[in-house]
């Protein structure tokens, strides 16, 4: 047994068979008598020494077990079931090939043509192709299986198994030439490529306005790395973006592209993993977990739309893909490139402090203009008697676009028909019995649903408390779709949210329909806000710019600015100028005004001053300890215990500030109450071990046996 292989071991007093991975081998042990390994499951290591080091780094950085870290790295199909079989097997195809020379096969075929014409036909086909899949060979010749078996027995052909890969659907065509770079792009490429070729680890930030052509710079950088025999990982924030990226990069790099994301089948993920590990695929494109791809000779990692919170995992291991990428680049001696039109505040701060190299694309490619943005005050719309969610200005612009044959995208960050249903008489509101949130109404099936736990129920005809009339409050994607169809009954509207893209590949199919059929209007959630490139889209409408602005997070302003800037940037990406309408109840809000001007520099200056006053990142680091359980009092007590212990430890040096316990914004989810303790400090690396120890204490303390406790480094919320 060697490090990196999986084994079965007898676990606990009952010697329950458990699967594990060997991390290291030693001649001695501090534990005295040890149990023997039951079985070694791999003939060669699944994990390289570099991956084992990464797992150990993740244990310390992200408060997880090594096993959790390893499971995040490996595709699900590699793990064994209770009978000792892997959950997904290698896919093979039966092949047929000649065992004799083509000349001898031809002579035998000529001799057999009258008495065994099928055998003759099989041999003649194989003389032309040498080897073929048995199924195709029989299909093309019309021969029977018995004829093929007879040739095997005669020693003229042999059957063997050949491994084949289950591949995600990609549209491979002719390889396209490299895109032509403008002066600004060329300057950025030259500088970044020099860093990538230096053989030293480092990080760079490519800050470019929407439509500036960051992808073209990526393509040139990847070309250079592949030419050197190096591998590249490209991360995208959303599965919805992956098909477009695959199409773009496959047109330049062909079959060397591998795809890794959660919408693939288990078999596809397993086979793509093997293609990367074997070196058959050297450009990996995927979402957050693709950062673990076993790419050999890593030359570059690119994180596109690096500010997106989807790069942070909310389940164990609670890693940030950017942190993992920084570690991998440091170990491999290569460059990490962060790209965005609205960089994370911390990333831009590091770039301005000189920790990252900064490259800027200030203009759109081919001198296209940024969209013209107009803010609409929805309070004024209400005073004018317009009680719908679509302002008069947006309606007029949509009408103009439809008449010109141009397309429009409308964004609202809430799926369903209505945010909530309430009684106009007594004020009763439908709430989830398992979570501390209101139920969202879905008109398609006339059900009220909880978007946290999945609970649903039918909508009553009248208030269940007093029998009064029910009011529909707050619009979602379904309601906007309905309003659009009422305004434009002869116009097709396509909706894009998690309710319409449940099946694998369904988002890709919707995007293709929108692009190819020139459907006039698309309405959707965050899936439509970033990375998409539709040349005929000349109008973007933001239904409610206020939704994310007043969330209880110090990042609320940053997320709102990024969201608005990104969605506005979907307009005018072709030869026609773009427009955008932002609807809001707070038109004087500074963040909304900055987003309407697409002025990141101004937003950064005001936001960094606020962060400095608040002492929030990048001016401090942040850890949280979260407890959850069915008994709210026990959950609070567990957090109180952590807070008291930290106060005793930190109180001696004042190196950090401890806040809480406090309930999360949604305190109850699926009948479990959630409280947390927040720790701020200039440098918290010394506290991580202490916090980890406190989490273990809580998990083993009988007083908190019904409470789950975990720590998180730099949480998203």
Question: What is the role of each PLM region?
Answer:
Residues 649-664, 705-713:
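Short beta-strand elements
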Residues 175-182, 186, 190, 200-636, ...:
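Inter-lobe coupling/hinge segments of SF2-like helicase ATPases
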Residues 484, 567-571, 646-650, 694-702:
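Hydrophobic, Leu/Ile/Phe/Ala-enriched alpha-helical segments that form helix-helix packing faces
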Residues 1-340, 352-368, 678-680, 685-692, ...:
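Accessory, non-ATPase domains that flank or precede helicase/AAA+ motor cores in DNA-metabolism machines
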Residues 130, 667-668:
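Accessory RNA-recognition modules of RNA-modification enzymes
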Residues 670-672:
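C-terminal effector/interaction modules appended to NTPase cores
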Residues 253, 488, 649-654, 701-703:
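Short helix-capping segments at alpha-helix termini
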Residues 633-648:
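Extracytoplasmic/periplasmic
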